């Protein structure tokens, strides 16, 4: 298992390259300005809805593999991480609220695990992820918003919302496309629409394209090499212990 000291050093390396480090807000969500349009216009989500997720590893640059207690099995937080990715990439979302929703999802997921040790292991990455989020800058979020929002005249915004939700249902749940207009009618503001679209993404995860995080592959390689070296060292120690004094 990776030592706590090694984890801390790795964390400091990541922190040291982040230009947005702020001691006063250490561990607090980064506040980024929501996407805005020119006066007389509102942002609405572009179609097709394009969301990609690298899972939990993307939030920590592949460092999830180094978290103490991390097993090789399925990550119980993975759905929460995919939901966070969808939230950040949805037009009109608010970055720190996406992080808050992720923490609530993670805490509820870990609390629902019956085995105390497994529940504790599940919770360990949450605080690290919270710190990493506070060190993050707004660039990635801003890029997502620019890519996935389009500005339309205010009197056309609601029509565009209805059109988006209708297309979403046509693609991911055509049997219930009749719900689209009613749901869109409730999402009559930028924030409400972002909330609706994020909920749709969570309910219909096929709309999220899962991709591999290159940083995770790199960290997995480091962990594998470290474990192999430890096994070799243990074998050498065992061989040395087997050498009795009578053989000298």
Give short role names for the model-derived ranges.
Residues 2-3, 224:
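Position-driven detector of the extreme protein N-terminus
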Residues 3-19:
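Cleavable N-terminal signal peptides of Sec/SRP-targeted secreted and luminal proteins
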Residues 18-248:
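Extended terminal accessory/targeting regions
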């Amino acid at each position: 298992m990776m030592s706590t000291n090694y984890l801390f050093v790795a964390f400091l390396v990541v922190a040291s390259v982040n230009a947005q480090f702020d001691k006063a807000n250490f561990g607090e969500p980064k506040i980024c300005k929501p996407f805005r349009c020119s006066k007389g216009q509102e942002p609405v989500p572009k179609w097709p809805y394009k969301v990609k997720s690298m899972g939990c590893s993307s939030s920590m640059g592949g460092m999830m593999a180094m978290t103490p207690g991390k097993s090789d099995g399925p990550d119980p937080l993975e759905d929460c991480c995919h939901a966070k990715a969808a939230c950040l990439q949805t037009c009109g979302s608010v970055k720190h609220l996406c992080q808050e929703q992720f923490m609530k999802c993670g805490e509820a997921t870990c609390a629902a695990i019956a085995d105390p040790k497994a529940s504790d292991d599940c919770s360990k990455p949450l605080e690290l992820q919270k710190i990493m989020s506070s060190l993050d800058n707004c660039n990635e979020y801003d890029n997502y918003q620019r890519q996935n929002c389009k500005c339309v005249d205010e009197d056309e915004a609601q029509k565009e919302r209805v059109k988006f939700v209708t297309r979403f249902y046509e693609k991911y749940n055509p049997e219930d496309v009749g719900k689209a207009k009613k749901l869109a009618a409730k999402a009559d503001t930028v924030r409400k629409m972002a909330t609706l679209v994020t909920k749709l993404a969570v309910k219909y995860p096929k709309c999220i394209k899962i991709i591999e995080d290159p940083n995770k592959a790199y960290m997995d390689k480091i962990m594998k090499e470290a474990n192999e070296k430890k096994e070799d060292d243990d074998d050498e120690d065992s061989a040395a212990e087997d050498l009795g004094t009578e053989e000298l």
